[in-house]
Amino acid sequence: CDHHVPDDVLPPAVAILNAKRLDNTYPYTHLSGCGVGFKFMQAFAISNGIEFHHLIPLLDLVAVSIASDIVPIMGENRILAYYGLERLNRMPSSGLHSIIKICGLDKHNITIDDIVFKIGPRINAAGRMRMDEHDENAAPSGGHAAVNLLIEGNDKQAQEFCSIIDA
């Protein structure tokens, strides 16, 4: 999933999800990468009889993606950001809750600016950190720790991943 304009020649793949592809038929072309993934999951849910409420816990991540990717907050992004911020302020995922605490933010009053200037940079910086790829027993670091943080459901484990990316 991506939100950047793709190259003229696409790499071989089973699927390339990108709202800016020349052959795209989706009406809104400014979705963030995570927004594209969310819409894919929404279509999958509809096609497979899965109720939408199962996707609601993911909206906080979508809001973080919209703000961090600096995509226009209009149209569908505005709607996803609104409900994502609502989720982030009410019941954030364990990983985002840990980042909110590390940033010293009021967990019930997170704004898009907080994501752009405090939360997003921590996640993005972690993705640029290197880990020892030859040591399979090494603790996750860098991008691996950031991904693990964002998908972690256990608060204590999320705090450990958060301390790795905040180091």
Predicted regions span which residues?
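Proline-centered turn/helix-capping motifs that create local helix->coil transitions or kinks
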Residues: 8-9, 72
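Active-site flanking residues adjacent to catalytic metal/cofactor-binding acidic residues
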Residues: 1-3, 68
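Hydrophobic helix-and-loop "lid/oligomerization" segment in the mid-to-C-terminal part
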Residues: 46-167
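Histidine/acidic-residue-rich catalytic or RNA/ligand-binding cores of hydrolases
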Residues: 9-11, 141
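Short alpha-helices
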Residues: 11-50, 55-68
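Short, ordered loop/turn segments at secondary-structure junctions
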Residues: 3-6, 20-22
